[in-house]
Amino acid sequence: MVEFLELRGVEGATVLEIGGGVGEIQIELLKRGAARCVNLELSPAYDEEAKRLLREAALEDRAERRLHDIAAEPDGVEPADIVVLHRVVCCYPDYERLLGAAAQRARHLLVFSYPPRNVVSRLFVGAANLAFRLLRREYRSFAHPPSAMLGLLGERGLRRTFSYHTPVWRVAGLER
């Protein structure tokens, strides 16, 4: 993801990361010249570790962390040159609202990762969700249809110019 974005140009860019966790991608993009990063989370669970990592990298003045559901309230977020969603779409039930809001905020580039939709991933998601249900946890995982996700982004003016595959994850880089 970072390499794709760097090849397209991150110098002076604004970055919006949706579900960035502790912020490894944001820190890398800031180190490579991005001007500013905003990270949106649904939970404060990663905040302390993220703040520590930003402090250690001396980048805390160029990063902002917010609790915000962009799919529910897209207008509460400023557009950015680059939008990143790494291992997030699989955690959100309504990929159409999530990716639609992300596309709406992407001025130039959007990159996201997702699990392949095959027998293995569907079995894994089903087993994981059964375990979460038995443990009475609310979290659920999703293997959304890649062609539908990419089609939705295409309808919003983004075209795929990069793809990367591993056995467990797919990465799509799109440009406006």
Label each residue range with its predicted role.
Residues Y92-A102:
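A short, conserved alpha-helix within the catalytic core of class I
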Residues A13-G21:
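Conserved class I S-adenosyl-L-methionine
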Residues A72-V77:
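Short conserved loop adjoining the S-adenosyl-L-methionine
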Residues M1-E11:
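Conserved alpha-helix/loop element of class I SAM-dependent methyltransferases that forms part
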Residues Y139-R156:
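Short alpha-helix
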Residues V22-D69:
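Class I SAM-dependent methyltransferase SAM/SAH-binding core
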Residues I82-D94:
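A short SAM/SAH-binding and catalytic strip from SAM-dependent methyltransferases
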Residues R107-P116:
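Conserved beta-strand signature within the Rossmann-like core of class I S-adenosyl-L-methionine
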